[in-house]
């Protein structure tokens, strides 16, 4: 049974899963919107919400926490200077998931994640 499991495994070993989520996060913050499968979208949303909540308060410690996921100084600067200030008065709900339907090749459910 799947009771009290903290996250989705996405049918990948841990290092592969972390690399996938990191790549999706980087794309989300660079482009503001990405298309992926629904389970991946839900996992990326969880992490993106946490990172944006951290980024709302600018400090060296918070920048290091965000850098641990993004690994790109310019992108961290963009998150703290451009993206996070837009959400200063918002308590969560920084991302939106829109379902796109099934992918033609393998019938996987597609979704768009975008920053609100």
From Swiss-Prot:
Entry GO MF terms = structural constituent of ribosome
Q: Record keywords: Protein biosynthesis included?
A: no
Could you tell me which PROSITE patterns the record lists for this protein?
RIBOSOMAL_L17
Q: Which InterPro entries match?
A: Ribosomal_bL17, Ribosomal_bL17_CS, Ribosomal_bL17_sf
Q: Name one GO biological process term.
A: translation
Where on the tree of life does the source sit, at the highest rank?
Bacteria
Gene Ontology, cellular component aspect: cytosolic large ribosomal subunit
Alphabetically list the UniProt keywords: Ribonucleoprotein, Ribosomal protein
> Which HAMAP family does the entry link to?
Ribosomal_bL17
**Family the entry assigns:** Belongs to the bacterial ribosomal protein bL17 family.
Quaternary assembly: Part of the 50S ribosomal subunit. Contacts protein L32.
Protein name, entry field: Large ribosomal subunit protein bL17
